[in-house]
Amino acid sequence: MSTPADYFTQLFFEVFESLPRQGPGSRNSAAQALSFCGELPSVPLILDLGCGSGSQTFHLAELTSGSIVALDTHGTSIERLRAASVSRGYGKRIRAVVGDMAKPDLPPDSFDLIWSEGAFYNIGIACALDVCRP
């Protein structure tokens, strides 16, 4: 028997999977949010949690010179992001991985910027803050 969370996930992807974005946002809103981040290294290491198929990941690649690790639980979205990264010329800067944003299997304090555009609500604020400040 599936849980309500399983049902929500299935329903979410039925509705949003084929769309270019799986949540709110735009290149302009990403640029504005980045302007509030303060000074980043010239080539920042960015973690994009809950990246979906990567619309905001590409905005980050366009707006920074950084290397981006894009993480999402949905394998189909990650495959789409991998293919699009290569076709758009970002294959060396974007590494798309399947993983759990509530428990990313990544070394703590290894990123200059943690980004999550319209996804953290899925794990709750307390968990999201724990991920950002381990």
Where are these regions (language model features)?
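N-terminal, positively charged/glycine-rich alpha-helical extensions of SAM-dependent methyltransferases
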Residues: 1-14
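Class I SAM-dependent methyltransferase Rossmann-like catalytic core
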Residues: 12-24
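Conserved alpha-helix/loop element of class I SAM-dependent methyltransferases that forms part
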Residues: 23-42
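Class I SAM-dependent methyltransferase SAM/SAH-binding core
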Residues: 47, 53-103
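A short acidic, Gly/Pro-enriched loop at the edge of an enzyme's catalytic core
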Residues: 102-113
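A short SAM/SAH-binding and catalytic strip from SAM-dependent methyltransferases
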Residues: 113-126
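A short glycine-rich, Lys/Arg-flanked "PGG" loop and its adjoining helix->strand segment in the class I
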Residues: 127-134
